[in-house]
A protein has these predicted regions:
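Alpha/beta-hydrolase-fold serine-hydrolase catalytic core, especially in secreted/extracellular enzymes
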Residues: 1-67, 349-352, 358-495, 503-509
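Active-site-adjacent alpha-helix of alpha/beta-hydrolase-fold enzymes
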Residues: 303-380
């Protein structure tokens, strides 16, 4: 809390200082133009006042400041052996061989397919009268007759295709948010997928509605699958109903996890008097810059099991400025009965809105957006390209069983030359993983589930709960060991196994973070030594295979460039 308070004090000081300078310079301009005090000193004051106001307006209405840390960090990659070309991947990522076809559906006419409505009143609170009037004016509907509507992309030449249902998040009710993923629908349709972008605008500009969003998504799935079985419909036989993926952005990214739960349940967790009967064959979830815990089923966090899960987050997200998707990622668990993966990708320079072409580069509305820094973003085209490639690889593995490039989800660096140039941080977990330790068992530093732990020559050795950032008020309910040292050669941390552990072909993986905050730091390096029961040793040095970046010094507002504070 102290860090947040100090940052608030610094920001307040600069805000007061700017206000004082503008007030003073405004008086100088007023004296010259209105009072007509045309003396030498008044002229100097007038010129100074004009400079101050021009600088302020340029600061306010400009895009802000550029960052150097991305290019500086990328230069550190010279320490890492660069991966060569991956055969066929460039062609794989290009537009596919199928011809995309686009249709619309909805209950109000003027669409290619006519659908119905759904009563969402059990899942969303009644609004005040003027809110209801406002909502019905723009949507022509109420919570009691929410439209089942959206847009469908599918491959013209193919049938029995896997299907992806996409849900947008909260935005202005006047924007057609569901149209913002046309680029993704066209791309995936060309690769043999049906892509349905669901219109949930009826629930925008309100709170406490994520459970209603989930029900609306599931009702859309039911309606589209019904059309899939109707010979008179243009989507007849296009969809493989055994291969369904859910995809969501922002609140939609959180909601797809709730929808997955509701699909498994027979009753609404918040009121069991309302029943469910969905049970669609949902195999995979893709969350894009998701929120978290806006809806808690029966007061619990949304925990998922035995489903493939992919989450992407931009480091420059000015709406969800903390990687909240990490919390849901860590609430995905696997049994040993199948083959599943959870993977996450953190993208430097990506914001919240550029994943949706209707939302754009400003993640907050006027007038607050005037303070946002947007000059340090990657382009919208690059941001969307990252989502397209990651989604295709993930869906091909999960829904089509294609593993050719599936290691993209565990080793993006192998494919880095095919991705837009920026920084990426990846983590993953597979269902066949065996954990040596995850630091969740107790507070004893010298124990691990599989054996014992020892450490020497560190200035700090502790286990602690992770936070998403220094200023984050919440915790991630995930623990790690924290080590700090000065003598690189002498310091060591050792885990000794009680019993031999059979190793698969995947090797040993470590999740690690560099907690240093200065971009000018040289890449962190340490060695991992593996000793077997016969005394044979294998040594791997970190910098020989990868680079562990320091924390990204992200600045979301223009004022942070003046105060020098990072997120």
């Amino acid at each position: 809390y102290g860090s947040v308070g100090n940052e608030h004090m610094v920001s307040t000081f600069f805000a007061v200082l700017i206000y004082f300078l503008l007030l003073l310079s405004g008086r100088f301009i007023w004296a010259w133009l209105v009072k007509r005090r045309h003396t030498l000193f008044s002229g100097i004051h007038f010129a100074a006042g004009c400079i101050v106001w021009c600088a302020f307006l340029a600061f306010l209405f400009g895009q802000g400041f550029s960052d150097r840390y991305i290019s500086d960090y990328l230069k550190k990659n010279i320490y890492v052996t660069q991966a060569g070309e991956v055969a066929g991947f460039a062609d794989y990522c290009a537009k596919g061989a199928y011809t995309p076809v686009c249709l619309t559906y909805g209950p109000d006419g003027g669409t290619d397919m006519t659908t119905g409505t759904v009563d969402l009143s059990p899942y969303v609170a009644k609004e005040k009268k003027w809110h209801r009037i406002y909502r019905s004016f723009f949507t022509k509907h109420t919570r009691k007759d929410a439209p089942i509507a959206g847009k469908i992309w599918f491959p013209k030449e193919a049938e029995n295709c896997p299907v992806v249902f996409m849900a947008h998040g909260n935005h202005s009710i006047t924007a057609e948010s569901y149209r913002g993923y046309d680029y993704l629908g066209e791309y995936l349709a060309s690769h043999g997928y049906v892509f349905v972008s669901v219109d949930e605008n009826i629930l925008n500009e309100r709170s406490g509605e994520n459970d209603a969003r989930a029900v609306l998504l599931l009702e859309n799935i039911g309606e589209i699958l019904e059309k899939n079985g109707d010979e008179s419909q243009p989507v007849y036989s296009k969809i493989d109903e055994d291969n369904i993926a859910l995809m969501g952005h922002s609140r939609g990214g959180e909601m797809i996890a709730d929808a997955y739960l509701f699909n498994e349940y027979d009753a609404y967790p918040s009121n069991g008097m309302f029943t469910f009967d969905y049970h669609y064959r949902i195999r995979a979830l893709i969350a894009v810059a998701p929120s978290v815990s806006q809806y808690l089923p029966a007061g619990h966090e949304t925990e998922l099991s035995d489903v493939d899960y992919l989450v992407l987050q931009g480091a420059n997200d000015q709406d969800i400025s903390v990687f909240l998707g990490n919390e849901q990622y860590e609430n995905v668990s696997f049994s040993k009965d199948g083959s599943y993966i959870a993977s996450s990708l953190y993208i430097a320079g990506a914001n919240h809105g550029q994943f949706n072409t209707e939302w754009g580069e400003y993640d907050i509305g006027r007038p607050f957006s005037l303070w946002l820094n947007v000059k340090n973003f990657i382009t919208a085209e690059d941001q969307q390209e990252i989502l397209k490639i990651a989604s295709l690889v993930f869906l091909d593995k999960s829904l089509k069983g294609k593993d050719t490039y599936a290691d993209f989800l565990t080793d993006y660096a192998k494919y880095e030359e095919y991705l837009p140039e920026t920084l990426y941080v990846q983590q993953y977990e597979t269902s066949d993983a065996l954990f040596i330790t995850d630091y969740e068992e107790d507070s004893d530093l010298e124990t691990a589930p599989c054996g014992s732990v020892s450490a020497e020559h560190f200035t700090m050795w502790t286990e602690e709960e992770l936070a998403d950032s220094e200023s984050a008020m919440g915790k991630r309910e995930n623990h790690a060991v924290r080590l700090k040292w000065k003598d690189t050669k002498a310091a060591y941390y050792e885990i000794a196994l009680d019993e031999p552990m059979a190793m698969g072909e995947g090797g040993i993986c470590f999740d690690a973070m560099d907690l240093r905050e200065k971009a000018e730091n040289e890449p962190m390096d340490f060695s991992v030594v593996l000793t077997d029961i016969h005394g044979n040793r294998a040594v791997s040095t970190l910098c020989d295979s990868t680079i562990l970046y320091p924390a990204f010094p992200v600045k979301l507002s223009k004022l942070q460039y003046i105060t020098g504070k990072n997120e």
